[in-house]
Amino acid sequence: MDEKARLLRVRARLKRKKPKFLRQEWWRFPKFKNDPKWRRPKGIDSKMRLKKKGKPRSPSIGWSSPRAVRGLHPSGYEEVLVHNVKELEAIDPTRQAARIARTVGARKREAIIARAKELGIKVLNAR
C-alpha cells in the first residue's frame, strides 16, 4: 500500500504538468471548440506533426502515469459501476470502491448506500 500511495502522488504531480491535448488549430473553427478531442495531425506541412517549438504538444508515451496506478481513482481504489444492491456483493472492499450509476433513482440509491455501509464498501458518489 505504501508503494501504491507513492505512485498516486507521482501520478498527481505528472497530471498537473500534463497539457490538454487538443487537435491542430482547434481555436480557428467553432466545430472543434465545442468538441475538444485529440486528432493526430497528418498534413505534410504540419508544424505540429513535426513537433516545432511554440506549437501545441502531442501525446506521447512519456506523458503517461505509472502502470500500477493507471485508471485508478485518486483515492487509490478501482472504480466499479453499481446499478443495484446485488452488484455490491461482487466488490472487494480492500481494493475496489462503488460508483452508483447515474440512472439509479433516489430510493434504490439509499438502499445501495445502506448496504455498502454494512459491507464496508466505499461509495464514491454518495451524496
From Swiss-Prot:
CDD domains xref list: Ribosomal_L32_L32e
UniProt entry tagged with the keyword Glycoprotein: no
Keyword Ribosomal protein: yes
Gene Ontology cellular component annotations, sorted alphabetically: cytosolic large ribosomal subunit
PROSITE patterns assigned: RIBOSOMAL_L32E
Compositional bias segments (type: Basic and acidic residues): 38-48
Keyword field: Ribonucleoprotein, Ribosomal protein
Gene Ontology molecular function: any one: structural constituent of ribosome
Disordered: annotated segments: 38-66
Any single GO BP term: translation
HAMAP family in alphabetical order: Ribosomal_eL32
Listed PANTHER family: 60S RIBOSOMAL PROTEIN L32 AND DNA-DIRECTED RNA POLYMERASE II, SUBUNIT N (PTHR23413), RIBOSOMAL PROTEIN L32 (PTHR23413:SF1)
NCBIfam families in the cross-refs: PRK08562.1 (NF006332)
Family (UniProt): Belongs to the eukaryotic ribosomal protein eL32 family.
Protein name from the UniProt record: Large ribosomal subunit protein eL32
Organism whose genome encodes this protein: Thermococcus gammatolerans (strain DSM 15229 / JCM 11827 / EJ3)
